[in-house]
Amino acid sequence: WVAEKLIMEAKKRGLNACIVRPGYIVGDSKTGVTNTDDFIWRLIKGCIQLHLIPTIYNTLNMCPVDYVAHCITVISLSSVASDRGVFHITHPKNPSFRFIDLFNSLILYGYNVTKAEYVIWRNELMEFTLQQEDNALYPLLHFVLDDLPTTTKAPELDYKNTSDIVGQECMVIDEKLMGIYLGYLVKVGFLDKPEPHDKGKVGGLEGKILDLPDIAALEGVEILKRSGRN
């Protein structure tokens, strides 16, 4: 908010400037390289540790970093961007991506997790962290226990300005792309690999379990994070 006020003031004083508002920025869509010290991936890891996923159906506006970088570059070089003012970088609305889709990807790739209502999930998480503090969500406990279905509700954003100038929609976060992200997180040791499974048995996803891709190109890649926390 403060940064946007500064940009608005700069425009008042005659400088060419615009505001770019991306959604949740996640990893590269081709390599899966992503920052692990991040709410989304901590949420995923915490659910795996708890063996539970909450049934939250809010829209999750996730955008791969390579798309966000492309948008920022094109907008920055546009001669009309300053006149447009604000640019939202969003996941496509059709099909949209929801928190439940994020969590379902864990089932799809063979993780031992079960769906539960948010209140049940929250109570189990509270009990888990009372016994031990090594859950990935422990640093964010105050947030995830504070009515996550309400606090994660997001408004619909108008991306017409971005669409007009960039001319390219964000790639859809689908099961293949989620596999790339999970594959990277396993590769760098942030997530454990799913246990061996019977491909004929999986709950709620029409009986199909996929294998995580082998991110061979990432040999020797260091884990990316903002801090020393695991």
Features from the language model and the residues they span:
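Short glycine/proline-rich turn/loop motifs
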Residues: 48-56, 143-146, 163-165
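Flexible glycine/proline-rich, aromatic-decorated loop/lid segments
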Residues: 19-22, 34-49
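Alpha-helical substrate-binding/gating segment
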Residues: 9, 41-54, 60-97, 103-111
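Amphipathic terminal alpha-helices
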Residues: 156-230
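Conserved sequence/active-site signature of Rossmann-fold short-chain dehydrogenase/reductase
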Residues: 25-27, 94
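Active-site Tyr-X1-5-Lys
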Residues: 1-21
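Beta-sheet entry/capping signal
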Residues: 14-19, 23-25, 84-88, 170
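Terminal hydrophobic/aromatic helix or amphipathic segment near a protein terminus
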Residues: 99-153, 172-175, 189-202, 229
